[in-house]
Amino acid sequence: MCPPTIWEKGGQVGARWSLRAPEVSAMAEDGSEEIMFIWCEDCSQYHDSECPELGPVVMVKDSFVLSRARSSLPSNLEIRRLDDGAEGVFAVTQLVKRTQFGPFESRRVAKWEKESAFPLKVFQKDGHPVCFDTSNEDDCNWMMLVRPALEPGHQNLTAYQHGSDVYFTTSKDIPAGTELRVWYAAFYAKKMDKPMLKQACSSVQAAGTPEPSVSVEPERGQWVCKVCSNTFLELQLLNEHLLGHLEQAKSLPAGGQQHEAASEKEPDAPRMEPPTAAESKSIQSVMVTKEPKKKPRRGRKPKASKVEQPLVIIKDKEPSEHVAEIITEIPPDEPVSATPDERIMELVLGKLAAPTNEASSVPKFPHHPSSTIALKRGLVLSSRHGVRRKLVRQLGEHKRIHQCGTCSKVFQNSSNLSRHVRSHGECAHGDKLFKCEECSKLFSRKESLKQHVSYKHSRNEVDGEYRYRCGSCGKTFRMESALEFHNCRTDDKTFQCEMCFRFFSTNSNLSKHKKKHGDKKFACEVCSKMFYRKDVMLDHQRRHLDGVRRVKREDLEASGESLVRYKKEPSGCPVCGKVFSCRSNMNKHLLTHGDKKYTCEICGRKFFRVDVLRDHIHVHFKDIALMDDHQREEFIGKIGISSEENDDNSDESADSEPHKYSCKRCQLTFGRGKEYLKHIMEVHKEKGHGCSICHRRFALKATYHAHMVIHRENLPDPNVQKYIHPCEICGRIFNSIGNLERHKLIHTGVKSHACEQCGKSFARKDMLKEHMRVHDNIREYLCAECGKGMKTKHALRHHMKLHKGIKEYECKECHRKFAQKVNMLKHYKRHTGIKDFMCELCGKTFSERNTMETHKLIHTVGKQWTCSVCDKKYVTEYMLQKHVQLTHDKVEAQSCQLCGTKVSTRASMSRHMRRKHPEVLAVRIDDLDHLPETTTIDASSIGIVQPALGLEQEELAEGKHGKAAKRSHKRKQKPEEEAGAPVPEDTTFSEYPEKEPEFTGSVGDETNSAVQSIQQVVVTLGDPNVTAPSSSVGLTNITVTPITTAAGTQFTNLQPVAVGHLTNPDRQLQLDNSILTVTFDTVSGSAMLHNRQNDVQIHPQPEATNPQSVAHFINLTTLVNSITPLGNQLSEQHPLTWRAVPQTDVLQPPQAPAAPQQAVQPQVQNEQQQMYSY
């Protein structure tokens, strides 16, 4: 008896399917209640409850399964049901500020069917949004359960887009038991076209005067403008808003008339009142952060002259860190008549002390330094008697932090932060202010648009479409507006860095670059101008001493003189013709054409400038970068290098220049160590300090000790040990015991300092601190040799090894050496064959991630870079440049060391070696070292001197299509035509000198014989009177049979590399089991292979009517593919499988007499001889 089948409303099946289900479904749909029917197969009827005969049905339901949204909830969160029946996410434990959740996971659709209470989108680069469908809990994670905030006080999470995902970040500390409520970040809300949460405004009094004490207090973290009562979620937005009020106040007329005019036009406008004492205290707390808050002094009346004029705005382009602190001297208890702009400024500063609900404003303020700096930008306090600016270090000991509120990235100044903040709105059309007129692409920065126009909408040649040409860089544009916007100034690089002498096209780029060099520490004693380097300051100070008149621009304009005569004119180098922006830069460049007068006393290397020499010292002492400034100067001074440049071409007296070497006996000074050494040896008869290893001499003992570090492996003087402290584990040298002990922490293996961004761990805290510079992407360590910037000192030290040629990391497989360990590890992966990175689009694997990323461009953007010579396409510009360099850039003709073939490009040489000498690429010399001497195969053991074969230069110029046609033509030649092929000119083949060009042209041709198991083929002729065949004749008719070896190689054709006659006395072959011999007939073209030593014996024959040739194949694969000794490889293991040749096919040479020494015939033995064809 079968169990009954259960049907539910809507046709859903309980036990199994029935054909009558649709009828039951229709019956159920007519009723208002859900009806469940039971189909009984015994009585063939439906029952609404149970069958009278069989009884009730046992119901089995599925076990309860949580949805994806509820099962993905973190352990420190829980879902609670509220009183109104809704559900919310609550914190089980306290969540600190800046805690990030995400990414938000859901099904992504192009458009919503129904918008949810808290819609989310992701804006792509093309501007089209992708919507998040949060209708199904099984498609989303727990973040869909977080309810949106309705008021600012409820919000504790901020939603924002980062990349192609959406994240939630806590905007304040969330205590345990608090519900999580989310709303959009400021810029994300602008993209989503959603309003920001606003605080309810306070009621305005009947008189129209707003009282700050009566205003409604905003929630924590909200900022209210006291001028217009607008509310802002972030302090930076309030700052930018307040600057607009200040601009309006600045444009109004000053004095009491302004006040009256404003009252007449706007009768309902609130009157401005003097600030209260509390507001004045707030002003002081904002302005002075370096010292603790002090109570205002009582009982002292201020002087009338102390009253300051209102604050005004000046447009300052300098970064915010160069703006001085502003200290106002308005007494807090002295009421002053306030103008509207003063009142606005007081409201601004009074509000900026802290949010209005904060009880203590001063301790909370240091947490918002970036906002204060952004507001103080450009504010200068002026007086009637002039401008007074007091420079105070900003924020004292408090470190300035410019942090992005969206992604938490930290910047050095507010201008970089403001530029970065716009990048978060790069996908929203509303945030992009600059539009490309050609492709309508939007950009948030003007610099990005300029770069886009120069790269995407310009060419280097003028044509009918691109007819607007830039006079500076030569680029052409399709539209005139694009050329005007381009505004190229690349050739007019008039701004030079004083630290590293690099040139920049704009002053703003130079200012950004100067931040890499740190603070300006050296001031001119005459004009107090600050410099980064002391030598540059001294050079500047000489201009004052020389009486150079400093002319102000105002004086020139007043006198009517032309400004052109004082403008820096471009100057060209008289030696090389290079043009510089001014004569001073050209004079610095002229030093490169002169003598290298600054010599390293340790290694003897010479330099043009002393600052480059001082940077070079880091190569010898790796830990010198860890010293502070005082220790570094003292240590460098010990080895005889001063911080001043000794310019021999200077017009000043010798006494004005500092000297490095001073004689203690006669008080004479010298600029170079060699001059000082010569002086003490000739005048005072002193020997100095000599190195017993390299026999160099030094005047100073400290320089001698520093030099001895080079000979650290063979130190003769025990006193030098105080300068040398080697590590017993790795052998690295340190100049102090403290640095050595600190270095030993690396070898303990304990890495207790982890990076929070990438998870990498380090043994020391200073190593972690140095590693953090990698994430900042600031390259402040410049190479003194090439000017390349590095992120860390460690990277600079390794980079300097490239200039020195130091390669200390060796591959244990192929013994190739590298300067950096990371490059060696990448190279070693090629030996292991490990490929950890796979392309998810095509399944191809790679050993390096960057190689895989480059490969993915084939699937995404395709091959966009085309070679103008051969029309090959490449993914990246670098690959195209590499192709042109290797393939099309002609170099001096190179000859193959094995066969003498000449090629003109590196790619041709690589192709030649791969096709003609594949064993050189596959077999290393190290693999043959363990073999016995008797098995070594070389030219002496074979007894054949190979001729030097090569191709003519004219033949190399032919394309590969011409070569293919030439090969096809040669294969169609008849045997009698091939018999007339010439022989290369050689001392052995002197009877064929006139036919060398024809022969050499055919030797280098490509064939199908890319054979791994064949190293060399020597073809010899039996009769010197018979014309020798060409290199490919006689082997093309060999019967092809698949050959199985240990390596699994197969080949179809063979290519000889030398052709000649075999004579008994001078060309005797020393055959062994490693040589495979093929005997072939020059007339019929048939061939036989011999694989034993006694198969071919050379002895004179009376006459050779049917001359034969012998080809000897020297097999190197048998040396490396088998462990068996060489003598047993062919005879016992038979690594090659041959097919026997019938005896009737064996060529039997006639036994006619012939002159000895002139005809050589291979003796073919009878039944015992094994002859095979392939």
UniProtKB/Swiss-Prot annotation:
Cellular localization per UniProt: Nucleus
Feature: compositional bias, Low complexity: 1154-1174
Cross-link (Glycyl lysine isopeptide (Lys-Gly) (interchain with G-Cter in SUMO2)): 552
GO MF entries: methyltransferase activity; promoter-specific chromatin binding; RNA polymerase II cis-regulatory region sequence-specific DNA binding; zinc ion binding
Assigned keywords, A-Z: Activator, Developmental protein, DNA-binding, Isopeptide bond, Metal-binding, Methyltransferase, Nucleus, Repeat, Repressor, S-adenosyl-L-methionine, Transcription, Transcription regulation, Transferase, Ubl conjugation, Zinc, Zinc-finger
Top EC group: transferase
Disruption phenotype: Mice die before birth and show early postimplantation developmental defect. Display reduced embryonic stem cells (ESCs) proliferation and self-renewal capacity. Show altered transcription of naive pluripotency and self-renewal modulator genes.
Extent of Acidic residues compositional bias: 644-655
Basic and acidic residues: bias regions: 261-271
EC number: 2.1.1.-
Tree of life domain: Eukaryota
Region (Disordered): 252-307, 639-658, 957-1007, 1147-1174
Residue ranges of every copy of the SET domain listed in the record: 75-185
Protein name: PR domain zinc finger protein 15
Naturally occurring in which organism (per UniProt): Mus musculus (Mouse)
